[in-house]
Curated annotation (Swiss-Prot):
Pathway: Cofactor biosynthesis; thiamine diphosphate biosynthesis. [4Fe-4S] cluster binds at C408, C411, C415. Belongs to the ThiC family. Substrate binds at N65, M94, Y123, H162, S184, R185, G186, D225, G226, L227, R228, E264, Y291. It is an enzyme of class 4 (lyase). It comes from Desulfosudis oleivorans (strain DSM 6200 / JCM 39069 / Hxd3). This is Phosphomethylpyrimidine synthase. Gene3D superfamilies: Radical SAM ThiC family, central domain (3.20.20.540). It comes from the Bacteria.
Length: 426
């Protein structure tokens, strides 16, 4: 029986109780959120790890994408990325591998990860066909659903499935309508398959089949935004909104089937449109948790997209987004390395925390109050402990060699805090 089914029966599961304790909420509040579809607790029946909740009233969570590519595939390197992401504070990792031994990478991640694990099953289908020198055109619905069921059986806690890329919605993302067209890998593959076969998306057409698989393993469905805008000029257009309408209907069907579901969101979005996008998703999707990539607030900052993503992520979280997918400095440029992973997680955590303060999530200000008290006391060790990233501030201060231990090299003897402390505590 799934978490949703138990919640609807009034049962507080072990996972719900654990989430309630970590969030400082009552178990009943978490149970009611799960029953209503406003909270998900991803966790495959075949995996055991500390459960984490995503959704309304909870702290904003952060995901880190790792995984190979056709041009770069090293299982050991992906393991180091996994370790780096978790050490930096990621609540989730997604294996987005598309090259090399995909099974070996996924097996390693599922065995080694102490946090929830997600993936995009259609990538495996595409990679296998490519390895056999076959076009994605040759994919059959059975091949796709077989991959989904196999990966769920292996232990994935949630899967991204681009069910909302219908023929009607994909047509609205044509080259004559958008600057960048379709920028989602899964979305573009399905759009091309539908175009070539003149058939509907099997994930949409056979959604009940997908629900059956997800329910069997209590896998959370992350309904992918295959038509997300890849340019700020494309944001909030017909294709994006049509897909969101479809996802709202599918989310309702998932809840009716006692399957946990969350919705993925844009993308590249001007900062003034982010709040409206979040509100629209919540309204159309019945309050389902919103999982956003960024959003990136400008297109012209390659190499710094962890910053554009953090800006958008903070605004989205403040408006009600629940789950931030990190963006790294390598976005749009290359496969992320270990340093990119660490920087991306920290940037997303800063965005999530900033959003939580704005949302007035219980306890969100505690860390800031701790940091401020330590700054007032010139307690440098305490400042390091209160920092989202304790390592970098310690490194920077120790490398600067201040003449006086109580101050830093920015102000030295002119330290405002020291001056005020001397005035108020003579």
């Amino acid at each position: 029986m799934t978490q949703v089914a138990r919640a609807k029966q009034g049962v507080v599961t072990e996972q719900m109780a654990a989430v309630a304790k970590s969030e400082g909420l009552s178990p009943e509040a978490v149970r009611d959120g799960v029953a209503a579809g406003r909270i998900v607790i991803p966790g495959n029946v075949n995996r055991r790890f500390a459960p984490v909740g995503i959704g309304s009233g909870l702290r904003t969570k952060v995901n880190a994408n790792i995984g190979t590519s056709p041009e770069h595939h090293d299982v050991a390197e992906e393991e180091r990325k996994l370790q780096t992401a978790v050490a930096a504070g990621a609540h989730s990792v997604m294996d987005l591998s598309t090259g090399g031994d995909l099974f070996a990478v996924r097996k390693m991640v599922l065995e080694k990860s102490p946090v929830m694990v997600g993936a995009v099953p259609i990538y495996e289908v595409a990679a296998r066909l490519s390895a056999e020198s076959r076009a994605f055109y040759e994919m059959t619905p059975d091949m796709l659903f077989d991959a989904i069921e196999r990966q769920c059986a292996e232990g994935l806690d949630y899967i991204t499935v681009h069910c909302g890329v219908t023929r009607q919605a994909a047509a609205l993302a044509g080259a004559d309508r958008r600057v960048t067209g379709i920028v989602s890998r899964g979305g573009s593959l399905l759009a091309a398959w539908m175009h070539d076969h003149r058939k509907e998306n099997p994930l949409y057409e056979e959604f009940d089949r997908l629900l059956g698989i997800a329910a069997a393993y209590d896998v959370t469905l992350s309904l992918g935004d295959g038509l997300r805008p890849g340019a700020v000029a494309d944001a909030s257009d017909g294709a994006q909104l049509q897909e969101l309408v479809v996802l709202g209907d599918l989310a309702r069907r998932a809840r009716d089937a006692d399957v946990q579901v969350m919705i993925e969101g844009p993308g590249h979005v001007p900062i003034d449109q982010i709040g409206a996008n979040v509100q629209m998703q919540k309204a159309l999707c019945g309050g389902a948790p919103f999982y956003v990539l960024g959003p990136l607030t400008t297109d012209c900052a390659p190499g710094y997209d962890h910053i554009t993503g953090a800006i958008g992520g903070a605004v989205a979280a403040a408006a009600g987004a629940d789950f931030l997918c990190y963006v790294t400095p390598s976005e749009h440029l290359c496969l992320p390395d270990i340093d990119d992973v660490r920087v991306g997680v920290i940037a997303a955590r800063i965005a999530a925390h900033s959003g939580d303060i704005a949302k007035k999530v219980p306890g969100a200000l505690d860390r800031d109050m701790q940091m401020s008290a330590c700054r007032k006391a010139l307690d440098w060790r305490g400042m390091y402990q209160a920092a989202i990233d304790p390592c970098l501030p310690r490194q920077r201060r120790e490398a600067s060699h201040p003449e006086e231990e109580s101050v830093c090299t920015m102000c030295g003897e002119l330290c405002a805090v020291k001056t005020h402390n001397r005035m108020t505590n003579p």
